[in-house]
Amino acid sequence: MIATSAEARNVDFYYRRFVLDRWFDREKDIICADGTMPSKPHPAIYKKAMERLGGEPAQCRVYEDLTTGIASAYAAGAGEIIAVASAALPEKLEQLPGVTYAISDFTDERIRKS
């Protein structure tokens, strides 16, 4: 599941460019900014994704690279928040409420262990 604040046209561009249909159904698995929900840090987009997945929020793992997204996931009750440190230092992101740990890339071994 992808929950993004990006607009549909941007999502569609990346969906095609990176051939994401290998892993995600565009209509079922991707929730994007469509004007019906407040933007992050409001938890609405993550709550919608969690409802769509059908599990409890505490069972959800979120990968997020922005502080507003981390705040959104935390407010939605995500059980595990993995901060992806693209521009910020991992140590700074790990100090944010709800962050389990921060990674610099998806080869981090902690992802496989949890």
Outline where the language-model segments fall.
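Conserved phosphate-coupling serine/threonine residues in phosphotransfer and NTP-handling enzymes
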Residues: 4-6
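Asp-based, Mg2+/Mn2+-dependent phosphohydrolase catalytic module
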Residues: 8, 12-114
